[in-house]
Regions:
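Autoprocessing Asn-cyclization modules and mimics
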Residues: 2-78
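Surface-exposed coil/turn segments at beta-strand junctions on protein surfaces, enriched
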Residues: 31, 111-115, 131, 164-166, ...
Length: 225
């Protein structure tokens, strides 16, 4: 199983207009370039150092610039380049790997190390900070080619007050895999503003981090003769 759940904390407070590098406890779990969620604002960045995000764009994906104080939670989000361009969905951690592994160069690719028939099941958590309902489409590719009939469309409601609309999309697909075959998850957003996002851990009540993306792969059988 694999997941994406980048999380850290803000080390130095930022004003509502600052575009200087953002200092955090650690960027180890974040991909670059990328985007982050801090309270109700999404911020794009182009690069990272061990403790900073650089190349900052404030108020992305329909959110508004606000000031943030040191100590608040920061989590990773994945957006699309635009309403007409889809994005692959990379993973940042491996929970268990038997016959399937992440490509070390491109972590959006989940590669077979043992040939067989596999059941791939995913869940993806989407947030919408705009005032308009949005549709998100998710599908799978094998070796860079769309898998027929693998797409599904789910609606993400508009925000309510300061809280985003949210939903979790989840389904599964059985795929024949030879050694070194790989699958990828892709998504698109009709508005271009809905993101796949990690929620921080809760304190009252206490609950664990809610990953933006989870994928499990179960070996079903050997390939048909």
């Amino acid at each position: 199983a694999f997941h994406q759940d980048g999380a850290t904390t803000l080390a130095v407070g930022i004003s509502n207009v600052s575009t200087t590098p953002i200092t955090v406890a650690s960027t180890a779990e974040f991909l670059a370039p990328g985007a982050l969620l801090i309270e109700s604002e999404i911020i794009k960045y182009t690069g990272v150092t061990p403790t900073t995000f650089t190349g900052i764009t404030r108020g992305a994906y329909g959110t508004t610039n606000v000031a943030h104080t040191a100590g608040v939670a920061i989590t990773e989000v994945l957006g699309v380049p635009s309403a007409t361009v889809a994005a692959p969905m990379p993973f940042t951690a491996t929970d268990a790997s038997y016959g399937i592994e992440l490509d070390p160069i491109n972590t959006a690719r989940v590669k077979a190390t043992v040939a067989g028939v596999y059941n791939f099941a995913f869940s993806a958590q989407f947030l919408n900070y705009t005032t308009v309902d949005d549709n998100v489409t998710v599908w799978m590719k094998k070796n860079g080619v769309d898998i027929p009939y693998s797409a599904g469309v789910t609606q993400v409601s508009s925000k309510h007050g300061s809280s985003p609309g949210s939903t979790i999309a989840a389904w599964n697909l059985v795929v024949d895999m030879n050694v070194n075959d790989y699958i990828e998850l892709y998504f698109s957003s009709t508005s271009g503003d809905t993101v796949c996002a990690t929620f921080p851990a809760g304190t009252a009540p206490v609950h664990p981090i809610s990953p933006s993306l989870i994928l499990s792969a179960t070996f079903v059988s050997a390939l048909p003769a």
